[in-house]
Curated annotation (Swiss-Prot):
Keyword Cytoplasm among record annotations: no
Species of origin: Mesorhizobium japonicum (strain LMG 29417 / CECT 9101 / MAFF 303099)
Catalytic activity: (S)-malate + NAD(+) = oxaloacetate + NADH + H(+)
Alphabetical keyword list: NAD, Oxidoreductase, Tricarboxylic acid cycle
Gene Ontology biological process: lactate metabolic process; tricarboxylic acid cycle
Residues at the active site: 176 (proton acceptor)
Record's protein name: Malate dehydrogenase
GO molecular-function term, one example from the UniProt record: L-malate dehydrogenase (NAD+) activity
InterPro entries: L-lactate/malate_DH, Lactate/malate_DH_C, Lactate/malate_DH_N, Lactate_DH/Glyco_Ohase_4_C, Malate_DH_type3, NAD(P)-bd_dom_sf
Binding sites annotated in the UniProt record for substrate: 83, 89, 121, 152
Ligand binding (NAD(+)): 10-15, 34, 96, 119-121
């Protein structure tokens, strides 16, 4: 039986972490791609030399040519410039849009049947552009944001309640940025909704509001602490959850930046919503009921994303006709 082939476009901190996690989870063979000569080869060799200790048989190959990703089952895109202190994700748009054009051409030529997970920021605009540049089916091009934002939300809630993260369910809607919408009403601790936990005296509305804001600022907090780059362990783990659900047809319900074609009243935009990921890619988009406050925040988040996609079209007018 042929092993899965997983291509990692970009061999920086997230790319290297992804490669190691793929080996540890035995998800398949890895091709690390990067335009910088020696980087993917060196990281691939380093991780391969950990395999006798960690006990995995994944083959790791480093390449500088898109031909190396040919026939990949999954492609995870991290290529581009990461944030530095004082930068917003949106500040990266002009630089990373050009990167997405190159990546899209590579995917179109060498991996047109792949399931593609985009991590590059500003996420919602970059995954939208990548789908257009590549021409791959919208069900097979998704953005990794909601899984990460939801994981941060869950972690902060578990810390507040002093319970296991395994017993906290929570998710985030909307764009991957300051306008994201952590869904308090749909978040629970062992099935108990957060509003009920406030009534029970476990926490206060003010404390929950602080946790929501810390979730929105989660990436910036890490950027500020690292000073030389951005988060990579949690983003990599989040993308692996998505890839594993696709490769194993697990049909997990995961919040992802998915293409909406009328759901939530939105058309032609990638935005974070809960979806089912299985062997067919994004097999279903789950529409949840939003109250007036949630709807207003979601619409504001969508408007922010649409502003970014319009900025993309100004830089690359050909996107308007794709």
């Amino acid at each position: 039986m042929a092993r899965n082939k997983i291509a990692l476009i970009g061999s920086g901190m997230i790319g290297g972490t992804l490669a190691h996690m793929i080996g540890l989870k035995d998800l398949g063979d890895v091709v690390l791609f990067d335009i910088a000569e020696g980087i993917p080869q060196g990281k691939g060799l380093d991780i391969a030399q950990s395999s006798p200790v960690d006990g995995f048989d994944s083959r790791l190959t480093g390449v500088n040519d898109y031909a190396g990703i040919e026939g990949a089952d999954v492609c995870i895109v991290t290529a581009g410039v990461p944030r530095k202190p004082g930068m917003s994700r949106d500040d990266l748009l002009g630089i990373n849009l050009k990167v997405m054009e190159q990546v899209g051409a590579g995917l179109k030529k060498y991996a047109p049947k792949a399931f593609v997970i985009c991590i590059t920021n500003p996420l919602d605009a970059m995954v939208w552009a990548l789908q257009k540049f590549s021409g791959l089916p919208k069900t097979h091009v998704v953005g990794m944001a909601g899984v990460l934002d939801s994981a941060r939300f869950r972690y902060f809630l578990a810390e507040e309640f002093k319970v296991s993260v395994e017993d906290v369910t929570a998710f985030v809607l909307g764009g991957h940025g300051d306008s994201m919408v952590p869904m308090i009403r749909y978040s629970t601790v062992s099935g108990i909704p957060l509003p009920d936990l406030v009534k029970m005296g476990w926490t206060s509305k003010e404390k929950l509001d602080q946790i929501v804001q810390r979730t929105r600022d989660g990436g910036a907090e890490i950027v500020g602490l690292l000073k030389t780059g951005s988060a990579y362990y949690a983003p990599a783990a989040s993308a692996i959850a998505m890839a594993e659900s696709y490769l194993k047809d697990k049909k997990r319900v995961l919040p992802c930046a998915a293409h909406l074609s009328g759901q939530y009243g939105v058309k032609g935009t990638y935005v974070g919503v809960p979806v089912v990921i299985g062997a067919g890619g994004v097999e279903r988009i789950i529409e949840i009921d939003l109250n007036k406050s949630e709807q207003k925040m979601f619409e504001s988040s969508v408007a922010t994303v649409q502003g970014l996609t319009e900025a993309c079209v100004k830089i690359a007018p050909q996107l308007a006709s794709k």
